[in-house]
Amino acid sequence: MGLRFSTASGYLFSVDNHLSESALEVRNAIKAELKDFLAAQRGYLTSIADELIPVCDALDEYLLDGGKRLRPLFGYAGFLSTGKIPGKNDVRALSSLELLQACALIHDDLMDGSDTRRGKPSIHRQFETLHSKNSLAGAPAQFGQAAAVLLGDLALVWSDQMLHQSGISTESLTAALSIHDEMRVELMAGQYLDVREAGEKVHDVKRSLRIARFKSGKYTIERPLHLGAVIAEPNPNRHAPLLHALSAYGLPLGEAFQLRDDLLGIFGDPATTGKPAGDDLREGKRTVLIAMALEKTSSSGRSELMKHLGASDLTSAQVENLRHIITESGAVAEVEKLINQLADESNSAAHNDVIHEKARPFLLALAESATKRSY
């Protein structure tokens, strides 16, 4: 039987061995907080100008109609790791991570030139279409790109605002802001390294792993865990050992999560991922998977990969050929092996006695979900 948690605010959460049940309750609470926050922001923006209604509509859809909510879920797990139970204000603070993620994805799609996100047009494509429908002057593509920069920036501002206005204690907010700042810096650093890697002539597995750690590992899992933990226990003398234990769990899991993402970016089912088949190949992503394939394949395979990697007009047949080269190189099997090794390391770390036992089933279920997902 799962553990039942209740708070004065009326939230009921379950933590048991079934992520689908317990995570759904937390996800619903996160969505409710985001919905309330976005409604308030809509009122403010539309009081400025009616032309901002499409901005509100786009961000509402982006934040409320999809997403795995992984970062707030890991934040929730970090809170539980102290042995305490999150209340409404705590959930609101953790929900701010979804706004930071929206900023990251909107800007990432713009930098990659991605046409879709979760099976729908990416933000810059949506506003490119809006420009055309309204017969505005200038270039539709440039308008869409400018809008995406601004909507991403707005989501970043809102993330900070939602955290500040969450209602958590002053001590918890001070501790949380330190983690929040580090997380944002690490995200931007990882993103820059990812962009720069595309220009490197020699591809290196170690460099790609470093990017995976900062762009995803720390930002997606380790720092959200830390954020939840320090909101629950802001005293550094008390939370320092826990943060260390959560890092031992979160860092390998974050890298495994990104490696799974690398595989899905090339081999994922478009109906499930919401992205075209082989999208990472067209975008020229220099992932760990690609770096391994370039190291392991034959000279002819390497030439073929380098010739077509980053070609936006790749045909389905060419995508299938590149998939074959990558698979035959042994890189797919090697990445799967590495994912399993990292997941085992993470699962072992979850059993550290510093982590409260009520968080353990949730952590283990999240780890399985992060590494065995299909989207």
Predicted regions: what they are:
Residues 44-49, 62-71, 146-158, 164-267:
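All-alpha helical catalytic cores of prenyl diphosphate-utilizing isoprenoid enzymes
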Residues 89, 168-178, 185, 238-242, ...:
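Acidic/histidine metal-binding catalytic segments
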Residues 118-152, 201-218, 244, 270-296, ...:
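Divalent-cation-assisted or electrostatically stabilized phosphate/pyrophosphate-binding catalytic cores
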